[in-house]
Amino acid sequence: LTEVETPIRNEWGCRCNDSSDPLVVAASIIGIVHLILWIIDRLFSKSIYRIFKHGLKRGPSTEGVPESMREEYREEQQNAVDADDDHFVSIELE
């Protein structure tokens, strides 16, 4: 039987003596932030892109406006939408 050299447990560990190097710390922080942003993007991508595309606008505030004026405004907005439904743009390519 021949003698077999087995590694000592200390050699299996991670040698991170230089982990206090600012470049290593910065790379670790950037990696963690990137991972967090990627996970958030995958979870909420539809709502995030919708916010960027349409903005946070939900229409003008109606606080302090009488109900009759609110109803009139709603009707004007609906009429404008209905009028747009009748318009079709025809583009002919030559």
Swiss-Prot record:
Function: Forms a proton-selective ion channel that is necessary for the efficient release of the viral genome during virus entry. After attaching to the cell surface, the virion enters the cell by endocytosis. Acidification of the endosome triggers M2 ion channel activity.
Residue intervals on the Intravirion side: 41-94
Gene3D superfamilies from the UniProt entry: 6.10.250.1640
Domain notes from UniProt: Cytoplasmic tail plays an important role in virion assembly and morphogenesis.
Listed InterPro entries: Flu_M2
Protein name (Swiss-Prot/TrEMBL): Matrix protein 2
Region (Disordered): 58-80
Misc: When the channel is activated, one or more imidazole moieties of His-34 probably become bi-protonated.
Record family assignment: Belongs to the influenza viruses matrix protein M2 family.
Cell location: Virion membrane; Host apical cell membrane
Organism the protein comes from: Influenza A virus (strain A/USA:Texas/UR06-0195/2007 H1N1)
Any one GO MF annotation of this record: proton transmembrane transporter activity
Location of Phosphoserine modifications: 61, 90
GO cellular component, one term: host cell plasma membrane
Membrane topology category: Single-pass type III membrane protein
Side Virion surface, residues: 1-19
Taxonomic lineage: Viruses, Riboviria, Orthornavirae, Negarnaviricota, Polyploviricotina
Annotated glycosylation sites: 17
Keyword Glycoprotein among record annotations: yes
GO term, biological process aspect, one: symbiont-mediated suppression of host autophagy
Subunit structure and binding partners: Homotetramer; composed of two disulfide-linked dimers held together by non-covalent interactions. May interact with matrix protein 1.
Major localisation: virion
Transmembrane segments: 20-40
Pfam families named in the record: Flu_M2
